[in-house]
């Protein structure tokens, strides 16, 4: 039964049809990415129904920044996926556990430092974005709440990276489905019923990510999928080095693609509120095409 428990999460991609394995593994991964993009779109769609152009612009500018941060975390977490996959491929359980433990320590540090830095820089970020005056307060509020939620975004993405490294790309997809449904329900509650505007959009996003992390942690505990000892959390230079060596170039590459979108947003923001809102919505649609 232990073997069964292990196999519930760990899937050997080196046996059977390569093409079939690749398709079965990559489809849920693509779908997860697609749903993550849908996240910011839901906020925009729902605030557009209940609020004015200023609030829509605030959410569109704020979610653009959050999307950039998210794709960079996803890119960095790719270092974890590769490290774990290589250890499992080499049938080295100890190394896989070490990679998981070091990932948790490394990304906890990244999340806390990132959150503190971004909260300190929230006003300069909103200024650099040339946010239209009417949308400044809404954007600051949206980003402040979302920045507080960065540990949840990071936790979701490293848990997903660990699952994928073990050959399971379906579970992360289910976690993001939970987050998307919760986000839509909470958006209608906070923006529709409670009329909280951009703050409601940010609260919906942050709380739904926390729910998603909670669900994924429960799944890990129930399945006993990852067995870690104290020494796995001890930072190993070569383990963390490898995660960063693989993850940083991917994070930078994905971040630079988003910089191009942000430059367009800045130009649109300088043209006033209506242009800013319109471009923000169109850019969300273009993000899909970049998947």
Positions of PLM-derived features:
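Transmembrane alpha-helical core residues of multi-pass small-molecule transporters
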Residues: 63-66, 110, 178-182, 204-212, ...
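Short alpha-helical transmembrane segments in multi-pass integral membrane proteins
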Residues: 1-26, 84-149, 193-248
């Amino acid at each position: 039964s232990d073997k069964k428990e292990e196999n519930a999460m760990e899937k050997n991609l080196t046996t059977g049809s390569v093409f079939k394995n690749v398709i079965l593994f990559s489809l849920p991964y693509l779908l997860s990415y697609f749903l993550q993009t849908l996240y910011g779109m839901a906020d925009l769609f729902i605030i557009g129904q209940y609020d004015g152009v200023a609030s829509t612009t605030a959410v569109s500018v704020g979610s653009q920044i959050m999307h950039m941060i998210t794709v960079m975390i996803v890119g960095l977490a790719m270092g974890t996926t590769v490290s774990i996959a290589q250890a499992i491929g080499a049938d080295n359980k100890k190394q896989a556990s070490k990679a998981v433990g070091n990932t948790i320590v490394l990304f906890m540090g990244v999340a806390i430092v990132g959150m503190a830095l971004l909260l300190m820089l929230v006003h300069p970020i909103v200024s650099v974005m040339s946010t239209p005056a009417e949308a400044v307060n809404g954007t600051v509020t949206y980003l402040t709440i979302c920045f507080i939620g960065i540990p949840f975004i990071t936790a979701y993405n490293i848990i997903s990276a660990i699952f994928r490294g073990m050959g399971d790309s379906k579970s992360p997809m289910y976690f993001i489905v939970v987050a998307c449904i919760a986000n839509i329900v909470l958006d209608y509650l906070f923006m529709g019923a409670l009329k909280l505007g951009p703050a409601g959009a940010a609260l919906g996003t942050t709380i739904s990510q926390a729910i998603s992390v909670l669900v994924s942690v429960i799944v890990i505990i129930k399945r006993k999928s990852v067995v870690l000892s104290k020494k796995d959390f001890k930072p190993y230079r070569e383990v963390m080095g490898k995660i960063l060596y693989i993850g940083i170039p991917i994070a930078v590459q994905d971040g630079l693609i988003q910089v191009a979108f942000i430059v367009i947003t800045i130009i649109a923001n300088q043209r006033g509120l209506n242009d800013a809102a319109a471009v923000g919505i169109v850019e969300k649609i273009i993000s899909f095409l970049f998947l």
